[in-house]
Amino acid sequence: MICHNQQSSQRPTIKTCPGETNCYKKRWRDHRGTIIERGCGCPSVKKGVGIYCCKTDKCNR
């Protein structure tokens, strides 16, 4: 699996994730504004955090 791997303030990067079958994109708000995080897997999240999980390469753009 190949996923986008970054946080809002970072430049976009790509990561190869051996053994993973999902990529994710999390989104939440705090005092800095809307924060977006991308990576490998499909983690559980706290209440108030939106998550999108997908199963194809680079699908979490």
UniProtKB/Swiss-Prot annotation:
<keyword id="KW-0872">Ion channel impairing toxin</keyword>
<feature type="disulfide bond">
    <location>
        <begin position="54"/>
        <end position="59"/>
    </location>
</feature>
<dbReference type="InterPro" id="IPR054131">
    <property type="entry name" value="Toxin_cobra-type"/>
</dbReference>
<dbReference type="InterPro" id="IPR018354">
    <property type="entry name" value="Snake_toxin_con_site"/>
</dbReference>
<protein>
    <recommendedName>
        <fullName>Short neurotoxin 2</fullName>
    </recommendedName>
</protein>
<keyword id="KW-0008">Acetylcholine receptor inhibiting toxin</keyword>
<dbReference type="GO" id="GO:0005576">
    <property type="term" value="C:extracellular region"/>
</dbReference>
<keyword id="KW-0528">Neurotoxin</keyword>
<feature type="disulfide bond">
    <location>
        <begin position="42"/>
        <end position="53"/>
    </location>
</feature>
<feature type="disulfide bond">
    <location>
        <begin position="17"/>
        <end position="40"/>
    </location>
</feature>
<comment type="similarity">
    <text>Belongs to the three-finger toxin family. Short-chain subfamily. Type I alpha-neurotoxin sub-subfamily.</text>
</comment>
<dbReference type="InterPro" id="IPR003571">
    <property type="entry name" value="Snake_3FTx"/>
</dbReference>
<keyword id="KW-0964">Secreted</keyword>
<comment type="function">
    <text>Binds to muscle nicotinic acetylcholine receptor (nAChR) and inhibit acetylcholine from binding to the receptor, thereby impairing neuromuscular transmission.</text>
</comment>
<keyword id="KW-0629">Postsynaptic neurotoxin</keyword>
<dbReference type="InterPro" id="IPR045860">
    <property type="entry name" value="Snake_toxin-like_sf"/>
</dbReference>
<keyword id="KW-0800">Toxin</keyword>
<dbReference type="GO" id="GO:0090729">
    <property type="term" value="F:toxin activity"/>
</dbReference>
<dbReference type="Pfam" id="PF21947">
    <property type="entry name" value="Toxin_cobra-type"/>
</dbReference>
<dbReference type="GO" id="GO:0030550">
    <property type="term" value="F:acetylcholine receptor inhibitor activity"/>
</dbReference>
<dbReference type="GO" id="GO:0099106">
    <property type="term" value="F:ion channel regulator activity"/>
</dbReference>
<feature type="disulfide bond">
    <location>
        <begin position="3"/>
        <end position="23"/>
    </location>
</feature>
<keyword id="KW-1015">Disulfide bond</keyword>
